[in-house]
Amino acid sequence: MHPEPAPPPNNSNPELPLSGGSSTSGSRRSRRRSGDGEPTGAPPLPPPPAVSYPDWIGQSYSEVMSLNEHSMQALSWRKLYLSRAKLKASSRTSALLSGFAMVAMVEVQLDTDHDYPPGLLIVFSACTTVLVAVHLFALMISTCILPNIEAVSNVHNLNSVKESPHERMHRHIELAWAFSTVIGTLLFLAEVVLLCWVKFLPLKRQAGQPSPTKPPTEPAVVVANSSNNGGITPGEAAAIASTAIMVPCGLVFIVFAVHFYRSLVSHKTDRQFQELNELAEFARLQDQLDHRGDHSLTPGTHYA
């Protein structure tokens, strides 16, 4: 009888290790130690290429220019929002004041029995006409430019600010702002004073009221007959009181307007000087970097 063949070797048998078991377990341990899943025998990654000094200068300059471009876009957006706010304020103020002037001119009732001074009616009519014309001009500018600025400001895109006409129409926007706030307001104050004179001047002293400039011993009939010859009537007193109140208010308004304009110009001038100093500092740093590059290239040319 032939002997039975030996069973095949089993990998799980600890008494019969495989010839390649040690290398397999070693490779597994090396993978666990390495942590990145790559065998230790793999070649290392090549180092990043060295950046030359001119390339570094170019990269730094491009980064600074990109930051400068973003700051310019932010400045353009601020100007756009400022122009939009000015146009909105001008349109509201002009519509309100011009409407009030028109209503005041229409609703005023002139006394046909009273002899008005010829210059009073002329000045009142001219002031009302100029007031309405100035405010309507400012309202027309606001109505024409504001929709274009609103259409651009509602688009959520940084580059859309270039499509807005606020830079090109800057003079028109400032003109509308000046007409509505400065000239229009001064004309409105003058309109109020003239309206008081036109409205209250026909009022005369009643028959039983004595004249304040004459003794009260005179008869009432004589006072009534001589009321037009001397003294101040109640209408004149009311008009003078309104004028005395409005003149200091007008002076205060003018002083405030001049002070506000000077403060605003001073603020803008300081901002311009600050931006110029920043540009000068940037130019100085750029010049230093350029000279440093020249110094770094000089020894190589010397040894060559």
UniProtKB/Swiss-Prot annotation:
Question: What are the alphabetically sorted keywords of the record?
Answer: Adaptive immunity, Calcium, Calcium channel, Calcium transport, Calmodulin-binding, Cell membrane, Glycoprotein, Immunity, Ion channel, Ion transport, Membrane, Phosphoprotein, Transmembrane, Transmembrane helix, Transport, Ubl conjugation
Residues that the record marks as modified (Phosphothreonine) are: T298
Q: Where is this site: Confers selective permeability to Ca(2+) ions?
A: E107
Q: Which residues are glycosylated?
A: N225
The record's catalysed reaction(s) read:
Ca(2+)(in) = Ca(2+)(out)
Entry keyword annotation includes Transmembrane: yes
Q: Where is the composition biased (Low complexity)?
A: 12-27
Topology within the bilayer = Multi-pass membrane protein
InterPro entries documented for this protein: CRAC_channel, Orai_sf
Record entry for activity regulation: Oxidation at Cys-196 leads to inactivation of channel activity.
Entry annotated with the keyword Ion transport: yes
| A cellular-component GO term for this protein | basolateral plasma membrane
UniProt similarity note: Belongs to the Orai family.
Check the record and name the PANTHER family matching this protein: CALCIUM RELEASE-ACTIVATED CALCIUM CHANNEL PROTEIN 1
**Assembly state and interactors?**
Oligomerizes in homomeric and heteromeric ORAI complexes. Native CRAC channels most likely consist of hexameric ORAI heteromers, implying that diverse ORAI1, ORAI2 and ORAI3 subunit combinations with distinct biophysical properties can operate in a cell-type specific way. ARC channels are heteropentamers consisting of three ORAI1 and two ORAI3 subunits. Interacts with STIM1 and STIM2; this regulates channel activity. Interacts with CALM; this may displace STIM1 and STIM2 and might thereby modulate channel activity. Interacts (via N-terminus) with AKAP5 upon store depletion.
Role:
Pore-forming subunit of two major inward rectifying Ca(2+) channels at the plasma membrane: Ca(2+) release-activated Ca(2+) (CRAC) channels and arachidonate-regulated Ca(2+)-selective (ARC) channels. Assembles with ORAI2 and ORAI3 to form hexameric CRAC channels that mediate Ca(2+) influx upon depletion of endoplasmic reticulum Ca(2+) store and channel activation by Ca(2+) sensor STIM1, a process known as store-operated Ca(2+) entry (SOCE). Various pore subunit combinations may account for distinct CRAC channel spatiotemporal and cell-type specific dynamics.
Q: Supply the name of the protein.
A: Calcium release-activated calcium channel protein 1
Say which species the protein is native to: Rattus norvegicus
Gene name linked to the record = Orai1
